Amino acid sequence: MHGTCLSGLYPVPFTHKAHDYPHFNIYISFSGPKYCITALNTCVIPLLHHILTTQCITLMLILQKIQHQNHLNIKIIIFQLYKINILTCGHYPLNSIPFTVT
């Protein structure tokens, strides 16, 4: 990565991609150099935090309701919840996620 990192701001030329995932970058200009803010701090990390928080709360509520069932059923339900969360990113449909990973 070129340029100096200062609180998440990376000075980059207009033609330079700050790293391999340009859709994770937000470019801003202060009447001069163009700066890049990685979207990991503004989009990706909050989204992951929301997914993990939602998944944890949902899992705890379901486990409270099925305490009397055997462990095999609990493992199957946890796996199904995990698959649903991965495919939908919590409650977001795939087509509404503001970025793509290539």
From Swiss-Prot:
The lineage of its organism: Eukaryota, Fungi, Dikarya, Ascomycota, Saccharomycotina. Pfam families: DUF468. This is Putative UPF0320 protein YMR326C. Contained within a telomeric X element core sequence. Belongs to the UPF0320 family. InterPro entries: DUF468.
